[in-house]
C-alpha cells in the first residue's frame, strides 16, 4: 500500500502544474484549409493536472504571420469562461489566404497561459470565384478531330445495327448513336403501353432533354407474336432516315429532320418500376457503319458480338446460356439499368498538363465533381499531409448534397506534389450520388462533371491559375470500368497507365465539352470528411473455402481460423468472416494470371439452413444477399498478372457487410485481405463498459451502427438499395449520436440538405438530401426543428439555430395550415405514424403530439436566440408558448375522456 501511494505521488509531481491550452480548432477542425465562412468560430481546451482550474478570460490574436506579430485582429481581453464557438470579429478575410492564430487564457489559479500549438486556418475562394473555371464533361470525339463536341448536327449516321432479340417481359430497348448519356437514341419494342397492340417507342435524348413518340405495329405483329420468341431486329440509318425491321419486315420509318443522330456507341436498357418490368435477351449483335468514298459506299463492321467469349464488348448485364448459346440477359432490379459498350462505359477521366514557370512557394487545388471523384497530381493521389508525414485521403468526395441546389468543393495543399516545369493533373469521376439509382432520377440522368482551379503562388510574389476548360482532355478507357453506390465497382488492372503523369501519350484521348447541368451553388466543404478509419480495420476471423453444395449446405473444402494466403481454384468459393458488421470495403492482395476475373460479393450474414421457405437464398453457410434487394453490391477485379501480386481497394462505392465472398474465373491466390471501415470521421468522445456482457454488446452495436450509417449523411442502412437520409430515423438517434461522437459540424451540413430539400410551402422532405418519397410527414419533417435544437442542447451551437430559424418558421407556418376534420391543430402528415410499432397507434394522434413538441421547441429556440426581453425572438418565444398551450387544449378535447384517460379515435 505504501509503495502504491508513493508511486501515485511521484506521478502527480511529474504532471505539469500550469494549465495548458490544447486542441485549438476552427469550425471544429484542426488547421483547416479552404473555409468559405466569413465569420470562423474558434475553440480550445484548457488542461491542468490541478483540480478546479477554470478559465476566467481569454484573448484571441489572428495574423498572417506565424508568430502573430502583426495582428489582423485581436479580441482584446474578454472576461469569459467560454472556449467554444468564439466568433471572429475582425476585418473581412481575404480569399485563399492562410491566417495564424493563438489564444491567451487567464485562469483562476495559475494565471496567464498562451497557446503553443501551431494553429492556423486558410480561407477558400469566398467571393473570389473560380477564375473562369468551367464544369466539363467527357466526349467520344478524339482530340485531333475537327468536330465540335457541342455541335450535335455533325456527321449524319450511316449505319446498320442487327441483333437477335427475345422479349421475355414488357419491352426490349436498344440504344444507338450514343455520344454520351445525354445524347442517345433509344428504340423500344414495347408490349406494355398500348392495350391493343405493340409499339415501336422512340426515345431521343438531346442534351439531356427527352422527346418520345410511338408507332403502332399491330398490323405486323401481335403481342403474343413478339413475347418469348426470338426475333431478328435491324435498325438502319441513312440520309437522315431511320428504318426499323423485325424479321425483315419494315415496321417503322423515322425521319431525323434535325440531324441529331450520328454514328456512335450502342447499348441496351432494362427498366423496373411504376408497374413496369422490362426483361429481354440479346445475341448475335453486328454494327456496320458506311462511308461514302466517291461513287461507292464502303461498309465496315465495327462491332460483332455473340457473347461466346469470357469477356464481351459490353460492360455489365448477365450472360446466360439458352439452348447452348450464350446471350446477354437484361434485367433491372430497380429503376433504369443500362449496359453500354466497354469503350464508352468506363469511368470518365480528365487530365491537363501545365507548366509551373517559376519556383513554387505554395499551391492549392480547389475541385469538385458531379458524381464521386478522385484526384491525382504527377501520378500521386491527392490527400491531406498530416504532421507525422502520413497522408489522409478523403473518400467519396464531394459527398452527397441536394445537387439541384448545392455542391461542395474540396481544397488541397498540393505544394509538395508540384515542381517547377511540367506537371499533370488528373481526375476520375463516377456516378456517385449524381445520376445513379440512389438518386431516383431527382437530379436527372446527365453526365458526370468536373471542375477545378489550381492556384500557384511563386516565391517572387506572383501567382498563376490553371482552371478546367476545353483544353482539358478526357477518356473513358481507364481501369475503373464502373462505379456505383448501390451496385459496386469493376476494375480492370490491365488498363492501368501513367495517365496522371506529365508526358503521357494522349493520342487516343478525346476532347471535353462544357457540362451545363449544375445550376446550384458551389460551396466549400466544412466538417468531418468521409475517410478510411484505420484503427477500426478488421482482419478475418476465419476463411471457408467450398465447392458447390451438398444436402442443402455448402460443400466445405477447407476452413482457416487465422489470416493466411488462400489458394482458390476455379469453381471454388471462399467466404471471409470479418467478425463485425461494418461499412466500407476490403483491401486485398492477389496473384493470378492476367485477365482472370475476381468477383467479390458482400453480405451481413450467412444462410443458416438453406431452406428457401424460411427466406434463405442459398445453401447453409453461403452469404445471404436477399436483403440487398436490387443492389448488386459487387466488386469485380480483373487481374493484370503481376508476379509479385497486386493490391487493390475500391474507391467509388461502399458496402455494408461482415462476410466477403470471392470467386474467380481461373485459379488465384489471395495473399491477404482486410476490411477497411469507411465513414464520416466524426471524433468519438465516449466509451462505456459494464459488468454485463449483453449491455456491452448493445453499446458496441450502437457504436458500430453509428459508424456505418454516418457516411456523408445520416443514413437508414448502408447495404441495400436505400442508404437514404431518412429524417425520422435521424431525429430519434441524433441525441444518442451526440454523446458518442462530435457530430455538430456533421449535422450543420445535413441541415443545409434539409433546407435545400424544403418545399416552397414549408414542408421538409422525408429524406435529406431529397431524392425520393414525399414531404411534410409527422416525426419525419419535424426533424427540421428537433435536430437543430438537439445540436444546440448538446454543443451550445447557436449558429445551427440561427442558420435554420427562418426555415423552421416556414415549417411552422406549413403546420398552421393543416386544419381539417373540425380541428385547428392536426400537425404534419400521417403517412408513417408510429413507424414499426408492435401495437397500432392512431397516426393523427402521433402528428398532433409532434406538433405540440415542435411548438415547445420553437419557444425554447427563440428564448436561446433572444438578446433581451423586448427583441423579436422574445416576442416569438411568447407566441410559440401560447401555440403549444392551444395545441394541448385541443388535444385534451380530442383525446382525453371524462375520466382523464387517453383515448385514440
What are these regions (language model features)?
Residues 2-8:
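Sec-dependent signal peptide recognition
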Residues 10-18:
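Hydrophobic h-region of N-terminal signal peptides that target proteins for export
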Residues 20-98, 102-151, 158, 165, ...:
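Extracellular/oxidizing-compartment recognition motifs
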Residues 317-320:
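Small-residue (G/S/T/A) turn/hinge positions that recur once per unit in extracellular repeat modules
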Residues 371-372, 381, 451, 467-476, ...:
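Active-site acid/base region of carbohydrate-active enzymes
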Residues 773-777:
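Short, motif-level signal for alpha-helix interfacial/capping segments enriched in acidic residues
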Amino acid at each position: 500500500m505504501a509503495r502504491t501511494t508513493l508511486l501515485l505521488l511521484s506521478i502527480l509531481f511529474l504532471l505539469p502544474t500550469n494549465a495548458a491550452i490544447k486542441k485549438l480548432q476552427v469550425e471544429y477542425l484542426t488547421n483547416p484549409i479552404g473555409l468559405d465562412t466569413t465569420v470562423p468560430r474558434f475553440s480550445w481546451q484548457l488542461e491542468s493536472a490541478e483540480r478546479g482550474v477554470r478559465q476566467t478570460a481569454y484573448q484571441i490574436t489572428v495574423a498572417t504571420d506565424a508568430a502573430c506579430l502583426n495582428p489582423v485582429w485581436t479580441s482584446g481581453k474578454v472576461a469569459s469562461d467560454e472556449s467554444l464557438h468564439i466568433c471572429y470579429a475582425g476585418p473581412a478575410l481575404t480569399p485563399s489566404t492562410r491566417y495564424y492564430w493563438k489564444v491567451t487564457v487567464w485562469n483562476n489559479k495559475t494565471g496567464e497561459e498562451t497557446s503553443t500549438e501551431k494553429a492556423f486556418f486558410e480561407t477558400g475562394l469566398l467571393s473570389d470565384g473560380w477564375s473562369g473555371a468551367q464544369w466539363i464533361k467527357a466526349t467520344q470525339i478524339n482530340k485531333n478531330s475537327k468536330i465540335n463536341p457541342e455541335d450535335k448536327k455533325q456527321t449524319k449516321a450511316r449505319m446498320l445495327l442487327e441483333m437477335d432479340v427475345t422479349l421475355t417481359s414488357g419491352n426490349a430497348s436498344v440504344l444507338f448513336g450514343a455520344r454520351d448519356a445525354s445524347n442517345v437514341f433509344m428504340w423500344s419494342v414495347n408490349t406494355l403501353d398500348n392495350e391493343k397492340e405493340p409499339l415501336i417507342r422512340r426515345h431521343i435524348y438531346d442534351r439531356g432533354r427527352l422527346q418520345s413518340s410511338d408507332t403502332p405495329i399491330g398490323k405486323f405483329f401481335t403481342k403474343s407474336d413478339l413475347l418469348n420468341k426470338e426475333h431478328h431486329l435491324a435498325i438502319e440509318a441513312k440520309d437522315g432516315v431511320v428504318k426499323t425491321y423485325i424479321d425483315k419486315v419494315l415496321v417503322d420509318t423515322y425521319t431525323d429532320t434535325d440531324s441529331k443522330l450520328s454514328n456512335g456507341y450502342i447499348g441496351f436498357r432494362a427498366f423496373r418500376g411504376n408497374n413496369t418490368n422490362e426483361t429481354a435477351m440479346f445475341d448475335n449483335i453486328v454494327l456496320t457503319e458506311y462511308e461514302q468514298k466517291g461513287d461507292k459506299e464502303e461498309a465496315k463492321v465495327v462491332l460483332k458480338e455473340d457473347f461466346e467469349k469470357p469477356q464481351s464488348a459490353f460492360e455489365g448485364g448477365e450472360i446466360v446460356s439458352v439452348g447452348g448459346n450464350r446471350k446477354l440477359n437484361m434485367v433491372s432490379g430497380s429503376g433504369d439499368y443500362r449496359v453500354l459498350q466497354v469503350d464508352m462505359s468506363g469511368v470518365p477521366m480528365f487530365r491537363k498538363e501545365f507548366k509551373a514557370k517559376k519556383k513554387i512557394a505554395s499551391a492549392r487545388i480547389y475541385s469538385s465533381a458531379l458524381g464521386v471523384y478522385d484526384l491525382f497530381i504527377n501520378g500521386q493521389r491527392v490527400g491531406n499531409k498530416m504532421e507525422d508525414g502520413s497522408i489522409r485521403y478523403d473518400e467519396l468526395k464531394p459527398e452527397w448534397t441536394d445537387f439541384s441546389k448545392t455542391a461542395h468543393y474540396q481544397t488541397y495543399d498540393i505544394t509538395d506534389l508540384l515542381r517547377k516545369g511540367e506537371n499533370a493533373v488528373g481526375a476520375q469521376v463516377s456516378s456517385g450520388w449524381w445520376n445513379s439509382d440512389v438518386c431516383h432520377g431527382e437530379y436527372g440522368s446527365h453526365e458526370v462533371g468536373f471542375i477545378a482551379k489550381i492556384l500557384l503562388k511563386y516565391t517572387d510574389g506572383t501567382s498563376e491559375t490553371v482552371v478546367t476548360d476545353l483544353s482539358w482532355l478526357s477518356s473513358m478507357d481507364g481501369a475503373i470500368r464502373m462505379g456505383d453506390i448501390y451496385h459496386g465497382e469493376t476494375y480492370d488492372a490491365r488498363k492501368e497507365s501513367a495517365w496522371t503523369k506529365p508526358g503521357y501519350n494522349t493520342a487516343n484521348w478525346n476532347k471535353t465539352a462544357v457540362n451545363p447541368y449544375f445550376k446550384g451553388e458551389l460551396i466549400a466543404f466544412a466538417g468531418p470528411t468521409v475517410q478510411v478509419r484505420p484503427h477500426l480495420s478488421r482482419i478475418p476471423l476465419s476463411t471457408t473455402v467450398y465447392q458447390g453444395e451438398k444436402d442443402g449446405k455448402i460443400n466445405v473444402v477447407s476452413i482457416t481460423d487465422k489470416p493466411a494466403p488462400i489458394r482458390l481454384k476455379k469453381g471454388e468459393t471462399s467466404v471471409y468472416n470479418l467478425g463485425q458488421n461494418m461499412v466500407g470495403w476490403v483491401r486485398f492482395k492477389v496473384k493470378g494470371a492476367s485477365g482472370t476475373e475476381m468477383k467479390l460479393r458482400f453480405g451481413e450474414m450467412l444462410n443458416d439452413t438453406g431452406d428457401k421457405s424460411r427466406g434463405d437464398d442459398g445453401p447453409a453457410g453461403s452469404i445471404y444477399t436477399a436483403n440487398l434487394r436490387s443492389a448488386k453490391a459487387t466488386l469485380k477485379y480483373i487481374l493484370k498478372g503481376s508476379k509479385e501480386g497486386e493490391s487493390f481497394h475500391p474507391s467509388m462505392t461502399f458496402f455494408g457487410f461482415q462476410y466477403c465472398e470471392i470467386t474467380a474465373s481461373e485459379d488465384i491466390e489471395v495473399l491477404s485481405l482486410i476490411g477497411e471501415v469507411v465513414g464520416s470521421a466524426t471524433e468519438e468522445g465516449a466509451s462505456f463498459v459494464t459488468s454485463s456482457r449483453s449491455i456491452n454488446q448493445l453499446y458496441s452495436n450502437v457504436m458500430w451502427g453509428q459508424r456505418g450509417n454516418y457516411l456523408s449523411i445520416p443514413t437508414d442502412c448502408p447495404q441495400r438499395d436505400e442508404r437514404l437520409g431518412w429524417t425520422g430515423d435521424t431525429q430519434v438517434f441524433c441525441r444518442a449520436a451526440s454523446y458518442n461522437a462530435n457530430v455538430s459540424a456533421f449535422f450543420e451540413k445535413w441541415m443545409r440538405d434539409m433546407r435545400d430539400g424544403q418545399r416552397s410551402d414549408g414542408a421538409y422532405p422525408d429524406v435529406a438530401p431529397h431524392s425520393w418519397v414525399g414531404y411534410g410527414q409527422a416525426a419525419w419533417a419535424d426533424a427540421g426543428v428537433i435536430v437543430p435544437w438537439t445540436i444546440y442542447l448538446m454543443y451550445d451551437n447557436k449558429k445551427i439555430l440561427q442558420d435554420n430559424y427562418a426555415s423552421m418558421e416556414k415549417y411552422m407556418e406549413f403546420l398552421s395550415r393543416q386544419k381539417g376534420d373540425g380541428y385547428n391543430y392536426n400537425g404534419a402528415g400521417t403517412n408513417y405514424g408510429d413507424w414499426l410499432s408492435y401495437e397500432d397507434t392512431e397516426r393523427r394522434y402521433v402528428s398532433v403530439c409532434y406538433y405540440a413538441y415542435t411548438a415547445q421547441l420553437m419557444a425554447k429556440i427563440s428564448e436561446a436566440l433572444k438578446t433581451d426581453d423586448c427583441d423579436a425572438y422574445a416576442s416569438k418565444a411568447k407566441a410559440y408558448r401560447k401555440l403549444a398551450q392551444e395545441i394541448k387544449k385541443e388535444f385534451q378535447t380530442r383525446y382525453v375522456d371524462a375520466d382523464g384517460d387517453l383515448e385514440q379515435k
